[in-house]
């Protein structure tokens, strides 16, 4: 596993939980002897929903809701077998979506 790289993408609606999870992953990887680059903040995806406040008419009266998806990227450059094993056992908070590419 000398030339391989592990790329971890994290997504969450709450940036505080996302940063805590990223720090746990970086700390675990560094403790097992791997070289880590990140967490790199990626652009926040913002989705806006516009709805009418009234049921029947009054189109001028609208309300907008937004949903923000925060993203982080972590690259583990030289993972050891111990790194992969410790990352598999890592317990992260709920609400964080994790994509791992080897």
Swiss-Prot record:
GO CC annotations, alphabetized: ribonucleoprotein complex; ribosome
PROSITE patterns: RIBOSOMAL_S10
A GO BP annotation: translation
SMART domains, per database record: Ribosomal_S10
SUPFAM superfamilies, sorted: Ribosomal protein S10 (SSF54999)
Domain of life: Bacteria
Parts forming coiled coils: none
Pfam families linked: Ribosomal_S10 (PF00338)
A Gene Ontology molecular function term of the record: structural constituent of ribosome
Keywords on record: Ribonucleoprotein, Ribosomal protein
HAMAP family found in the cross-reference section: Ribosomal_uS10 (MF_00508)
Quaternary state and interactors: Part of the 30S ribosomal subunit.
Family: Belongs to the universal ribosomal protein uS10 family.
Function: Involved in the binding of tRNA to the ribosomes.
Name the record gives this protein: Small ribosomal subunit protein uS10
Record gene name: rpsJ
């Amino acid at each position: 596993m000398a030339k391989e790289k592990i790329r971890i993408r994290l997504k969450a609606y709450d940036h505080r939980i996302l940063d805590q999870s990223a720090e746990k992953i970086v700390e675990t990887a560094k403790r097992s002897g791997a070289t880590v680059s990140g967490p790199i903040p990626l652009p926040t995806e913002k989705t806006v929903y516009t709805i009418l406040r009234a049921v029947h008419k009054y189109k001028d009266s609208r309300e907008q809701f937004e949903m923000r998806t925060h993203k982080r990227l972590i690259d583990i450059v030289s993972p050891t077998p111990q790194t992969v094993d410790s990352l598999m056992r890592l317990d992260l908070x709920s609400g964080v979506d994790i994509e791992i590419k080897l």
